[in-house]
Amino acid sequence: MSQTARRLGPQDMFFLYSESSTTMMHVGALMPFTPPSGAPPDLLRQLVDESKASEVVEPWSLRLSHPELLYHPTQSWVVDDNFDLDYHVRRSALASPGDERELGIPVSRLHSHALDLRRPPWEVHFIEGLEGGRFAIYIKMHHSLIDGYTGQKMLARSLSTDPHDTTHPLFFNIPTPGRSPADTQDSVGGGLIAGAGNVLDGLGDVVRGLGGLVSGVGSVLGSVAGAGRSTFELTKALVNAQLRSDHEYRNLVGSVQAPHCILNTRISRNRRFATQQYPLDRLKAIGAQYDATINDVALAIIGGGLRRFLDELGELPNKSLIVVLPVNVRPKDDEGGGNAVATILATLGTDVADPVQRLAAVTASTRAAKAQLRSMDKDAILAYSAALMAPYGVQLASTLSGVKPPWPYTFNLCVSNVPGPEDVLYVRGSRMEASYPVSLVAHSQALNVTLQSYAGTLNFGFIGCRDTLPHLQRLAVYTGEALDQLAAADGAAGLGS
């Protein structure tokens, strides 16, 4: 075994320790491709053969030093001297011609199986048999090895903007990229990002971010110069959130407003994955009509889809579901244009039947939350976010115990929206049609929705516990129908009514 070793950091250890038979801590991506005109019939075989003959570099060649004991105090990443690329690169086929729903079935099954932590924890699956001669690539990796942001960046670097490029390196030929502060400040349509910039794992980043937020609180309180000011500002913000009577702050969502819901139960190991893709211009046009962001529109149609989906299951709460959102905001004490990563809570308007009024409710709550954060300095933002999320620990404990508390929950699900490549990308001449994030779920979070923009489209990845939420594909379809209803609605209803 190689003598070089890299210790796992606290965040990586958190995801390793969270691994269980029902809560697998891997994330992934699904990318359908269309071959170029005149492509040979064995194009995918050639790509698989090329992949298996490639050189693998770190971190893709690393395995755990003590896979038999995940809690080992000196757990590290070491080079796997017996690395077997044939194990990690796999090929399968749908019954041709397969459609998007049929593609979701094997991806759901693959995502339901844990990675072998005795080996470098990643796999890539080439799936052929899609209608029109198309194929798909599904990649999954353990969050402790590659965080979602880094993984997405490496995947993007392994694709080319040139359809004639046949020499571009594959993702496991690319070492870990550097990460600049600017990378974490990109956003689309209103500033929602996946936690601290990660792309593939909305829920995972929220949980991981909570550790950083708690550390941020400690940093605030541990600073002699800033503790008094920040603590006072935090207290003032919390009080103001309760006392504000103006229209904007009346819509602020607190940390104990989420109804008890089927989404907040214990989960099994089985997963179901579904996708949807919409033109960004369509969402922008609706947002412009109602003075809402792209993210507001996305949340509203998710709310509309969930309203119908849960109603059909007989599980629709009387009160609206509450969503947790990672956001980027500019603190009031930052004159240099820097941003702070935080979390907010917002309504999904699942208690509202009218699509326009649902969008109005969503927009009002996100505006109030972001306005609240903009009134604070950076330290107070971190402390406020930690305080806002603190009751989630009680929610998780009640879920695990099976005893519902008499008070509401903190949030019902996580939604993340992250920027992806603006240009069309190719692998060996085949055009990537979409990039769907495949995130993770956990106890008390049986559903996660992660969005990613790509080449003028917005791609939705729905991942859920199959046993808790049967027929998840219907939710994806209902989200599209909610978009159609919103687009067809009479604009006279407006946000001000």
UniProtKB/Swiss-Prot annotation:
Protein name stated in the entry: Putative diacyglycerol O-acyltransferase MT3584
Pfam families given in the database record: WS_DGAT_C, WS_DGAT_cat
Keyword Repressor: no
Family statement drawn from the similarity comment of this UniProt entry: Belongs to the long-chain O-acyltransferase family.
BP GO terms, sorted: biological process involved in interaction with host; glycerol metabolic process; response to hypoxia; response to nitric oxide; triglyceride biosynthetic process
Keywords carried by this UniProt record: Acyltransferase, Glycerol metabolism, Lipid biosynthesis, Lipid metabolism, Transferase
Reactions catalysed: an acyl-CoA + a 1,2-diacyl-sn-glycerol = a triacyl-sn-glycerol + CoA
Source superkingdom: Bacteria
